[in-house]
Amino acid sequence: MTFKTEQEAFWAGDFGTEYIQRNQGDALLASNLDFFAKALRQARGIRSCIEFGANIGMNLKALKLLHPGIDAHAIEINAEAARQLGDVIPPAQVHHSSILDFSPARQWDLTLIKGVLIHIHPEVLPQVYDRLFAACGRYLLVAEYYNPSPVAIAYRGHSDRLFKRDFAGEIMDRHPQLQLLDYGFAYRRDPNFPQDDITWFLMEKR
């Protein structure tokens, strides 16, 4: 696989594989169930979904429990994560690819990206926004670190690996057919169902 940015190679390599061990387990699944029940409370009729940057499928596990029978697809850049993802959804529906190399051949009721845009180089974000929009049949859920203006911060000792900004606002500016339906915040110190200080935005394509 050939990469266009340093960030893609970073997540496809050993760091991305190590990430798997830090992000799994029943506690995370419970938090994800709570998260998606809240974030998707305004959504109706979700029968299919695609997740951009799904890792081993912890988000999709929760969505499958909340929406039994959902037709779930995913894109994942890391080979080991993509292999494990094939235990959660049918392997044929796992796209082992960089998001920048993915061209949606169809649309899904729900398009999801959670904790991924923050790790993509800002110069290629417009390309990612366009792919998210193209894949979106009705709902787009963006769940990321939020900052009103773009900022880069160190990530586990690495520079240029974590970027905060108003991702959802930029997507809606670029694609006015998307309208904000709901939004909220998930706090890392929540006593019951913590998440990693994620601000989420549910948009609907109209």
Protein language model regions, located:
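Class I (Rossmann-like) S-adenosyl-L-methionine-dependent methyltransferase catalytic domain
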Residues: 1-106, 123-127, 131-206
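A conserved beta-strand element that flanks and buttresses the S-adenosyl-L-methionine
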Residues: 112
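A short His-aromatic
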Residues: 118-120
